[in-house]
Amino acid sequence: MICFVVFDLKPYDEKEETGLIRTLMVRRGHYSGEMMLVFVTTRPKIFRIEQIIEKIVAEFPAVKSIIQNINDKNTNVIFGKEFRTLYGKDTIVDSMLGNQYEISARSFYQVNTEMAEKLYQTAIDFSDLTADDIVIDAYSGIGTIGLSFAKNVKAVYGVEVIEEAVEDAKRNAALNGITNAHYVADSAEHAMATWSKNGIKPSVILVDPPRKGLTENFIKASVAMQPEKVTYISCNPATMARDIKLYQEFGYKLQKVQPVDLFPNTHHVETVVLMSRVNN
């Protein structure tokens, strides 16, 4: 940005460990148009920051949030622990499949919103939901997938290990007036065991794991709840194939597969899979 030159903001040199600006992250709501800028800096003080903000907002009125993250470690991890709101809100708002979501600097939110809607709608269609269904949303994040399911079912139970994401999911449920979605910060295995003891019997378990896929312990814990269906959203075909094979060993049958291209002209692909229980 021109501001970097005008205000002499030096980029961080990883080898020399000099400079101020490590990363500039821009988030933009596809439907809202709201923008967030996140400056990742090596130290707390940004010289003439008020003037920088004034210039940015004047040139880009869609910017509703400017955040500073401080990362003084010699690491390739993008964010440090401390976030400061320099201007506006600490979130921006966007919508997906009719629901609104507050998105913070740390929130996971698909960058290709239009195709993410197709991805989630495919998962909904595959699951063939009824008003009596109970859905467990493992790896629930800020609630984007589970809340998309919620209007079609009796209840959604979401679990996520990142506490901030769980708070975001609860806030997003309230933002949309959704009262049948419940979120906890826990490991999926432990949460499912607790829910099972409390008599919760899911008809669908929804999973959207990271690239490493599911653990064997997770698969065993999910199978123990005996859901009729497992709807699996994957970003890694190799680990997805491995996990499907294990589900098949536990009595589940692969019913449907649909790739969805969220990242055109790359080798990355998202895939929605439906498995159903054929025996106990």
Residue positions per predicted region:
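Short, aliphatic-rich beta-strand segments
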Residues: 26, 33-42, 100-104, 204
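Intrinsically disordered, low-complexity acidic/polar segments
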Residues: 33-35, 46-48, 75-77
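Short flexible coil/turn linkers enriched for glycine and charged/polar residues
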Residues: 30-33, 62
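Rossmann-like S-adenosyl-L-methionine
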Residues: 51-58, 62-280
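Internal alpha/beta scaffold segment
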Residues: 1-15, 19-20, 42-67
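Residue-level recognition of strand-loop junctions within catalytic nucleotide-signaling folds
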Residues: 29, 42, 276-278
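A short linear hydrophobic-aromatic micro-motif
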Residues: 10-13, 24-25, 255-259
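Short edge beta-strands and adjacent turn/loop segments
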Residues: 18-31
